[in-house]
């Protein structure tokens, strides 16, 4: 209640939630967004299954304006789990196209989240140690592996992989991509001084720790084109 005893003026209502929204070339039927939520139902090679398609189709049919499909690894070494979706290979495009088509057929806009798990990956899944900004065990994974520190060359390969993944998403028919830089995954690890102890151009200062984010965003924009919407989940 306002100091005068009057209720503060409402600038929006729940009714706005159901009104259309247009931005960045996207036209949403409403403002309801399904965020990326891992379903854990991909094939062992990371490809899309009927269960994943049905899972997202139902949410789109329920009325979501935008469906952001669950995190999908851009490199095999960035895989978080054995049942995670992948966008690391052209072989994934066929299944991804079925998924995007199913979402769009129900009237929703379809986006795909691109990710690399960093040290939140596991040697049990990968068959090798995970890779991260520094050889530091992730605080979210106290029993996890101590990762290998990425070399500058491997960082460049990772940046390029995000660009490759964005092209695959676009070719598969997705309307947008989201870069996953949250939840303690690789890009989030680079940003935090707890997990980034580097003293080179990719560490040491906030400017250095955020360098890879700028490079990934620039590469995705370069590869996907100027008119393709890009979201960034930062955390």
Feature locations, PLM:
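N-terminal amphipathic alpha-helix/helix-capping segment at the start of soluble metabolic enzymes
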Residues: 14-36, 103, 221
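Conserved, mostly hydrophobic/aromatic
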Residues: 34, 59, 63, 103, ...
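Structural preference for beta-strand elements that scaffold enzyme active sites
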Residues: 31-33, 66, 109-111, 176-178, ...
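Glycine-rich, proline-tolerant flexible connector loops at the mouths of alpha/beta enzymes
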Residues: 68-93, 114-127, 178-204
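Catalytic domains of carbohydrate-active enzymes, especially glycoside hydrolases
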Residues: 53-75, 171-176
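Alpha-helix-loop-beta-strand connector modules within alpha/beta enzyme cores
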Residues: 85-110, 194-230
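Short, Lys/Arg-enriched N-terminal segments with co-localized hydrophobic residues
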Residues: 1-13
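Non-globular sequence segments
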Residues: 115-174
